[in-house]
Amino acid sequence: MPTVTPDQSTVALAPGEILQAVEHEFHGAPWLDMHTHLFMPSLGKLGLWGIDELITYHYLEAELFRSSNLRPDQYFGLSKRAKADAIWKALFVENAPVSEATRGVIAVLQAFGLPTGTGGLAEARKFFEAQKIASHIHKVFELAGISEVVMTNDPLDPEEAPLWEDGAAPDKKFHPVLRLDRILNKWTDQVDVLAAKGFSVDRNLGGKSIAEVRRFLAEWFARMKPVYMAVSLPDTFQYPEESVRARLIAEAVIPSCREFGIPASLMIGVRYQVNPALKLAGDGVGKADLRALERLAAGFPDNRFLVSVLSRENQHELCVYARKFANILPFGCWWFLNNPSVVEEMTRERIEMLGMSFIPQHSDARVLEQVIYKWRNTRRTLAPTLANTYKLLAGDGRPVTREDIHRDVQRLFRGNFERFVGLS
């Protein structure tokens, strides 16, 4: 695309030029993906990539059982390759891959010039097996139009924690995040794990337990240098309440975030394991009581909260709370919401209520190559949405320039996050 000169950037755009100007910005400087489940190369086999991982992603596993007679217990007894073959046959050969998740696989194959038809997976497997991870990451990020991602790092994961303790090499393209799900949602299961690591804690948070949890968080903050702490929470989450989780949040997590100068990310609305037979694919969604968020934002005005809610029915309420509390930053269209029709609706509502003071999207990618189609979908879906916003503004009498669009796009897809977490 041609370079825009400074003179052109300040000229008012005609309505017919606005969409092209937005698309130009969307394909300009790379964006920052502020929540993923990807891993830097030094964390080794934790990082998932390649065609078999793409096809056996739990979104597609959930779809498999709607289009196949294969039972979950039969499926989970198969090898990785056999699982991928079963999903390919059911969702890509015997059915047109029209869902968001299946189209994503097609988009990745197309991006690498691989066959997208109903043939087998041999050529794709051969291609991915030949890749070297460092150069492959560079190519994937280039295709996705991103420069860096934010990881999800669990200090109590028995596979991940030792890698950090052994000095996993940092990578400027991968920002760490201290994930707290095990501590906050499965405290009784983790007490003995923490005790074995030398922390004096008990199930009821007696004695030095709170101080010891803060010591644990401080050690991992120093080790990881995370850009925020994060937790996913159920649709039943309440605050305040008489529970171990509420005490840990109020007395350990919130003060630690404040001490370290980083936000807490709250992802609210999961209904865990509604169908345990599906394993990772077995979680559902529920409408949450966001008065818990209200009380946290009001009770801890010196803390910052990144917030994403899983239920579509909670989105308007989250926007209202963000208008009332500047320490709340709504982000992304998470999980079941990451479908183009819902992304468009949510983004339009957020712009109407919050201007440009939110983060429209993150990929939530669990497999490396997913960032290609997830960010492609985001650009394709949101360019018309943002362009229409500017057309309405121009129609109301305010000229819109390329400079305006450049500023806003950079704010939405990089600047708001960098400012909120202190990277800028």
Residue positions per predicted region:
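Histidine-centered active-site/metal-ligand motif
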Residues: H35-H37, M267, V309
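Metal-cofactor-binding active-site regions of metalloenzymes
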Residues: P2-F260, N303, C319-S424
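Acidic, glycine-rich loop-and-beta core segments that form the ion-binding/anion-interacting portion
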Residues: P234-E294
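Active-site-proximal binding-pocket segments
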Residues: R271, N275-G282, G286-C333
